[in-house]
């Protein structure tokens, strides 16, 4: 009996090693492109963005989920770094603070050129990986960080932003967040306001991916129905597996499928198991469910490392991605499906967003109605509190000019 137990144990170990080896072989040519990592936030909170401090050395930093050796061990070849500031910056210094976080990402690329290469388009991601670099891209987490300005949106694009999360844990004046669905916030726009729809259109024109993590279900549906390009959820999981309002319900997954969009699964325990503890296997359950409902082309990885506190057993840091891929292979995911999950689905969506951008040329020039803005910390040059009055004055001036011209002729 003992011999039989030993034999089956040995067989299980060999099978496990086989799946792990297969995972690593796949990842050597198709690396992880992760949708969301909050290391820049850690650089702020731990080191006040002083990257040259000896204790901030990313080759040795131990207290974060992410460092250079862990990225290498995890076969991470592309990373969307989150440029994030909390909601209490809204209507205050949000734009200044997000510029500082974007600067951190650029300085990471400058300080570690042998590891990080800042890129801004889909074709450069795999080229950077083939040069042995981690392609580094910028996602801005929270629509409050554009301060309801299309000009700021365009400027952040020129600084490298390639996705914008429409809300964080607060409404913007033009989009509702997920706390509305929980009953902890009031619906102000019932999804997207008219100005919010202009923001979406301008993102399509620029080639900025629309990120629907953190938004309300109504905002999800508005964006999926209105966007001319596929959208992403950069760090969200499946509501049917864990009914947390930050996750994506099945009816929205159907829209994800019909629009060729993408859900990049979050590893935070509360979104994985709806409790303080979770396992790698439960993360795989989310991936299985999204694949079943929306298709294998709709799944990606957005671990949310360094943005959360509790992570599943087996996925404690960014080095653990090969173990997750091995589990999916054990569950009979095909190599094609795995390569899609790792990188190819994201590259497809990113390329489609760029294609739409190439055919949209005219920028939006409307501004948000001034009454939608908190005016305590802002000026209003160029705005009008009563546009109808200005139109009447304009018409009057035109009439007077016509009258003066007529009198001159007399």
Curated annotation (Swiss-Prot):
Keywords: Cell membrane, Cell projection, Dipeptidase, Disulfide bond, Glycoprotein, GPI-anchor, Hydrolase, Lipid metabolism, Lipoprotein, Membrane, Metal-binding, Metalloprotease, Protease, Signal, Zinc. A lipid is attached at residue 384 (GPI-anchor amidated serine). It is an enzyme of class 3 (hydrolase). It is a lipid-anchor; GPI-anchor. Inhibited by L-penicillamine. Beta-lactamase activity is inhibited by cilastatin. It catalyses: an L-aminoacyl-L-amino acid + H2O = 2 an L-alpha-amino acid; leukotriene D4 + H2O = leukotriene E4 + glycine; L-cystine-bis-glycine + 2 H2O = L-cystine + 2 glycine; a beta-lactam + H2O = a substituted beta-amino acid. Glycans are attached at residues 57, 121, 332. Disulfide bonds join 87-170, 242-274. Its cofactor is Zn(2+). Residues 1-16 form the signal peptide. It is found in: Apical cell membrane; Cell projection, Microvillus membrane. Zn(2+) 1 binds at residues 36, 38, 141. The keyword Protease applies. Zn(2+) 2 binds at residues 141, 214, 235. It comes from the Eukaryota. One of its GO terms (molecular function) is GPI anchor binding. PROSITE patterns: RENAL_DIPEPTIDASE_1 (PS00869), RENAL_DIPEPTIDASE_2 (PS51365). GO terms for biological process: antibiotic metabolic process; cellular response to calcium ion; cellular response to insulin stimulus; cellular response to nitric oxide; glutathione catabolic process; homocysteine metabolic process; inflammatory response; leukotriene D4 catabolic process. Belongs to the metallo-dependent hydrolases superfamily. Peptidase M19 family. Homodimer; disulfide-linked. This is Dipeptidase 1. The lineage of its organism: Eukaryota, Metazoa, Chordata, Craniata, Vertebrata.
């Amino acid at each position: 009996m003992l011999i039989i137990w030993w034999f089956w144990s040995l067989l299980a170990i060999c099978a496990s090693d086989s799946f792990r080896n297969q995972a690593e072989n796949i990842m050597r040519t198709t690396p992880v492109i992760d949708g969301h990592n909050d290391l820049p936030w850690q650089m702020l909170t731990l080191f006040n963005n002083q990257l040259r401090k000896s204790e901030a050395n990313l080759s040795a930093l131990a207290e974060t989920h992410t460092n250079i050796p862990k990225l290498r061990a995890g076969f991470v070849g592309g990373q969307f770094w989150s440029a994030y500031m909390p909601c209490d910056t809204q209507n205050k210094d949000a734009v200044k603070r997000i510029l500082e976080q974007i600067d951190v990402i650029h300085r990471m690329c400058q300080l570690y050129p042998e590891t990080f290469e800042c890129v801004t388009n889909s074709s450069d991601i795999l080229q950077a990986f083939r040069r042995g670099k981690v392609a580094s891209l910028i996602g801005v987490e929270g629509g409050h960080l554009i301060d309801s300005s299309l000009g700021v949106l365009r400027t952040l694009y020129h600084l490298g932003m390639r996705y914008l999360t429409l809300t964080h844990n607060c409404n913007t004046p033009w989009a509702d967040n997920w706390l509305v669905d929980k009953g902890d916030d009031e619906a102000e726009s019932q999804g997207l306001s008219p100005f919010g729809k202009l923001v979406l259109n301008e993102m399509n024109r620029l080639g900025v991916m629309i990120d629907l993590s953190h938004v309300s279900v109504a905002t999800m549906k508005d964006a999926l129905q209105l966007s001319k390009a596929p959208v992403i959820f950069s760090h969200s999981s499946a509501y049917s597996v864990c009914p947390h309002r930050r996750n994506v319900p099945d009816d929205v997954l159907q829209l994800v499928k019909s629009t060729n969009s993408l859900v990049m699964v979050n590893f935070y325990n509360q979104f994985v198991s709806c409790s303080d503890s979770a396992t790698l296997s439960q993360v795989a359950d989310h991936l299985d469910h999204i694949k079943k409902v929306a298709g294998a082309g709709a799944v990606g990885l957005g671990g949310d490392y360094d943005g959360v506190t509790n992570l599943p057993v087996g996925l404690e840091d960014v080095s653990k991605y090969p173990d997750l891929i091995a589990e999916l292979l054990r569950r009979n995911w095909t190599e094609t499906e795995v390569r899609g999950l790792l990188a190819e689905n994201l590259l497809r969506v990113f390329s489609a967003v760029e294609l739409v951008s190439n055919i949209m040329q005219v920028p939006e020039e409307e501004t948000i109605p001034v009454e939608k803005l908190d005016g305590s910390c802002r000026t209003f040059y160029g705005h009008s509190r009563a546009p109808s009055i200005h139109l009447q004055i304009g018409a009057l001036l035109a009439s007077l000019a016509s009258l003066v011209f007529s009198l001159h002729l007399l």
